Each structure stands twice: as C-alpha cells, then as structure tokens.
UniProtKB/Swiss-Prot annotation:
It comes from Thermosipho melanesiensis (strain DSM 12029 / CIP 104789 / BI429). This is Chaperone protein DnaJ. One of its GO terms (molecular function) is heat shock protein binding. Binds 2 Zn(2+) ions per monomer. A zinc finger (CR-type) spans 144-226.
Length: 373
C-alpha cells in the first residue's frame, strides 16, 4: 500500500513555509468542498478528506517533523515490523520487537498519534463558512444598498435541536471504552507487556454515544435548507471588499455554532469617474476661451445629482480643480472625499476667418509678431 505524499496533495514543496501551506489548503478546500461539487460529490468528499488529512499533519510542526522523518504519523505502516519469514517463532519475536520499536517506544517519547488522526465524530464542531459574491453599481457607492441574498446552507435540525440524538433515546455508555473515554490495549512481547492508551474513536473521548441517531438528520444535528437574508452594503465600499456576516454560514455539527458568511463585493458598470481612495477624479475638457476667461460647468455626479463648478480664469492644461466634500463617503466614518477635476484645454485645429482676425489683433496687443497671410 503506497503511502500518501501530503506535500503533493497540497501542491507545495517539502520546504514550504507554514503560510504557503495554509494558503494552499485554503485554495484547495474551497475548490473541493462537497457543497460546491454537486455533480461529482463522491470524488469531492474523498479529495476533501485527503486535503484535511494532509493539512492536519503539515500544519502541525511536530507532526510534520515526524512525517518528514518517518514517512507517516500515527499507526505503524502496513509493512513495518517484518523479518525472518519461515522461521516460525523468530518471526513472531522480531515482529513484536519491530512493533515495539516502531510504535510503542515511539509513542512513549512522542505520544500516541492515533487520536489526532481521527476526527472526534460526536463532539460539537463549528459549521463551515460560506462565500458569496455580490455586484454593486458605482452609483450605489454613494448611498449604500441593501441586497437580498438567497442560498443553501445547513441549519440546526429542529427534530433533535442539533444534538443528533433521536428525542427520548438519550445517551448511553460507549461500549468500546465503557464510559472512560479512553481505550487501553495490552500486547505481550518478549520484552514484557506493552500498554497503549488512546482516546476512544467511537465516542470521541466523551464516554457517551447516542442511544439512537436522529431519524431526520441522521445524527449530524443539521439539515440542508434554503436561507434568505438581506445584506447591508455600506456607502463607500471598495471593489474587492469582503464583508463578514457572523453566523451566516452552515450550522455546526452536534450542537456546534454556526459558521460565518463572507460577502465578496464587486463594483461593476461603466463610469467616467476614477476612484482614488474616497476621492473622485474626472477629466474635464474645456475650450481654450473658457480657460482664459473662466466659466461654470455642470457635472453629473454618479448618484445622479448635478453639481455646478466654477472654473477660474487662467486655468492651465493639466491643472486639478478640487471640489471639497463631493467625493465618496468613507465606509467607516461617513466623511466624504473630494471631487477632483483634471483640466484638459482643447485647442481647435481650425478657426473661422473672423476668429482668426480677432486672435491676430489680440496677439498684436500682447506684443507678438504676427505673420500676415
């Protein structure tokens, strides 16, 4: 039986940092989550468990060190402890000795790993988080918007109130550990009796198991339902902002708390404005005469309002005109940024004879040498 390469499963090198391992895990766990792979749920569940197993080992420095050194964590690998086949008694002796060296002495110094390699199936666990993307328009950044959301999630089973136990059946003593929460194993070797003790994997160390699993949820304490909420997108939200809705995720297992809902905001739609922080920037083209004499322009803001702005005489090409307090509200304080108009002075490529004559007169008044046609 080939051993699993946890590094290969997560797609990282053997020298990967904890942050690289964590990022790889987050990416893969989203990709292979069973709730996102309805068409091939069986494969997704297998991949999901495999990824969880790999991360459980590589994210723990002690377990990772053991894995790097021995190639496994927990129970003795299938091919360990063999030798001297065909010599009857000697085979058993050396098998015991191999088991002792590979398992019992290892556990004496490093602790029994079997508990951590198996998830406790009956203890409360928080539910998974849910990620959803929503689109908002540039105009909605000014006022904020409430968006109705509808999605599937696991909720607490109303029949058993999330306990996973059929009402009236109660809890009974675990038959494997007899209520102690731990299992004791004794093995006789030529060195004597070796004792192993580990957390019971049937009751998860609680010493109790359901008398009868809930007939509605199958013992998980949760069932799948359609959930509807209204999410408040605050004014001033930026593209790529992630809003956390506490308790909006899946219900936990066996009475565990709800996970969270993460709303990923995308700002969509065309606009002639550019956003920089909470400031709005707009390129404004004006005639050269207006640049010289000054003028007033009307700007249609993203929220539909019309703002009249005075352009001073003598404004230069590329100059920025600030209109204070007309930008986007800050998402936290509500204070608005500024509107910034970048002036683009338009020079005509052709003028009428009358205009040309007047311009020459102006040029002479300014002491310029004017070429006569």
């Amino acid at each position: 039986m080939a051993k699993k390469d946890y590094y290969e499963i997560l797609g990282v090198s053997r020298n990967a940092t904890q942050e690289e391992i964590r990022q790889a895990y987050k990416k893969l766990i989203k990709k292979w989550h069973p709730d996102r792979n309805y068409e091939n749920k069986k494969l997704a569940e297998e991949k999901f468990k495999e990824i969880q197993e790999a991360y459980e080992v590589l994210s723990d420095p002690e377990k990772r060190a053991m894995y790097d050194k021995f190639g496994y964590v927990g129970d003795v690998p299938p091919n360990a402890g063999g030798g001297f086949r065909g010599f009857g008694g000697f085979e058993d002796i050396f098998k015991d000795f191999g088991d002792f060296i590979n398992n019992d002495i290892f556990n004496i110094f490093f602790g029994d790993q079997r508990t951590s390699s198996r998830k406790r199936t009956k203890t409360p666990r928080k539910g998974e988080d849910i990620n959803i993307s929503v689109d908002v328009s540039f105009e909605e950044l000014f006022t904020g918007v409430k968006i109705p959301l509808e999605y599937d999630r696991y909720e607490v089973c109303e029949h058993c109130h999330g306990e996973g136990v059929e009402p009236g059946s109660g809890w009974v003593t675990c038959p494997k550990c007899h209520g102690t929460g731990t299992v004791r194993e004794e093995r006789r070797t030529f060195l004597g009796v070796i004792v192993n003790q580990y957390t019971c994997n049937q009751c998860g160390g609680t010493g109790k198991i359901p008398g009868e699993s809930c007939r509605v949820c199958g013992g998980t304490g949760r069932i799948r339902k359609r959930h509807r909420i209204e999410v408040n997108i605050p004014a001033g939200v930026e593209n790529g902002t992630i809003l956390r809705i506490q308790g909006g995720g899946h219900a936990g297992y066996y009475g565990g708390g709800y996970g969270d809902l993460y709303v990923h905001v995308r700002v969509v739609g065309y606009t002639s404005f550019e956003r920089k922080g909470n400031n709005l920037i707009k390129d404004l083209k004006i005639d050269y005469v207006d640049a010289i004499l000054g003028t007033k322009v009307k700007i249609k803001m993203p929220d539909g309002k019309i703002k009249e702005v005075k352009i001073p005489s003598g404004v230069q090409h590329g100059q920025e005109i600030y209109v204070y307090g007309e930008g986007i509200p800050d998402m936290r304080t509500g204070r608005r940024g500024d509107l910034i108009l970048r002036i683009n002075v338009g020079i005509p490529t052709k003028v009428s004879r009358t205009e040309k004559k007047l311009l020459k007169e102006i040029a002479k008044l300014r002491g310029k040498d004017v070429r006569e046609d």
